Amino acid sequence: MPVKVHGVILMNIEEWEEYRYVEAGIKESITLIEDPGLKKMVEHVCHSGGKRIRPIILLLVSEICSGSYSRSLNAALAVEMMHSASLIHDDLLDQGLVRRNLPSAPEKFGPSGALLCGDYLIAKSIAFISPYGEKVIQDFGKAGMDMAEGEVLDLKLEDESFGENDYFKCIYKKTASLFAISASIGAYTGGAEEELAERFSHFGNALGTAYQIVDDILEFLEVVEGKESKFTSETLPHIYMKSTSKEEALKKSIDCVKLHVAAAKETLETFRECPARDKLFQITDYITVDMLENL
């Protein structure tokens, strides 16, 4: 169904071929799980309404680089499995109760079950990424380590010295790093050389950063739907509020989103014009500025 934010219906990404391709791959991988209890947990986590943005980015980039979806699908599934595992661990750390309008994995299956489900998804992501060669595997592993380091940085949010520079380092590792490798690995699976893959990585980094700041803004304004946690991360508007008014902090945060969106689009403009590139432009707006339209 279409995603609705503040009463406004955004584009229906579920109608996209890339979305259906990823969904079919996830469904097939779940059918291969032998243990019924583990299968139930993975189904709950992986079929809870995610937009599949990261694997879709990977597939679209591979198409821009003249690759094929069949060649790139396992890499896309690896990215989605890693992302799903990170959400479980995030809910464990934040004592998340609700995610995407459903009970979180720890709430539904207990901390031990959720932890094991996350472990399985990480192992499955490694299995999916393993055929793609040394460079791709190294980059994928580095992103996983970055995400863990980002969570460690996030634990320091109660430290009064946690400022803007710490925040951007944290969200690069927690969020933007996976966007960056989704784009760069898509380039590699499409046959691109390292220089082109690096440019796609810059696009993913800028988009992932903008996406996280938008998420922070919505949380700051208490308009996030379908998510509930006992603890929350530090947000950019809250950091700015330490030295300015709420209104100015919000404006500075929105300006920061626009800056990173512009950087992402500027990089996109350098790639060959094609329907896949057009979709990346749509995604860029869809998960950033479109979410802020009615604030």
Curated annotation (Swiss-Prot):
pH dependence text: Optimum pH is 7.
Cofactors demanded by this protein: Mg(2+)
Keyword Metal-binding on entry: yes
EC number(s) per entry: 2.5.1.81
Residues annotated for isopentenyl diphosphate binding in this entry: 51, 54, 83, 100
Cofactor descriptive note: Binds 2 Mg(2+) ions per subunit.
Pfam families named among the record's database cross-references: polyprenyl_synt
Superkingdom of this protein's organism: Archaea
Keywords attached to this entry: Magnesium, Metal-binding, Transferase
Record field: catalytic activity: isopentenyl diphosphate + (2E,6E,10E)-geranylgeranyl diphosphate = (2E,6E,10E,14E)-geranylfarnesyl diphosphate + diphosphate
Residues involved in an all-trans-polyprenyl diphosphate binding: 99, 174-175, 212
Binding site for Mg(2+) 1: 90, 94
UniProt GO molecular function: geranylfarnesyl diphosphate synthase activity; metal ion binding; prenyltransferase activity
Binding residues annotated for Mg(2+) 2, in chain numbering: 90, 94
Keyword Magnesium included in the entry's annotation: yes
Activity relative to temperature: Optimum temperature is 40 degrees Celsius.
Subunit architecture: Homodimer.
Entry similarity comment: Belongs to the FPP/GGPP synthase family.
Full protein name: Geranylfarnesyl diphosphate synthase
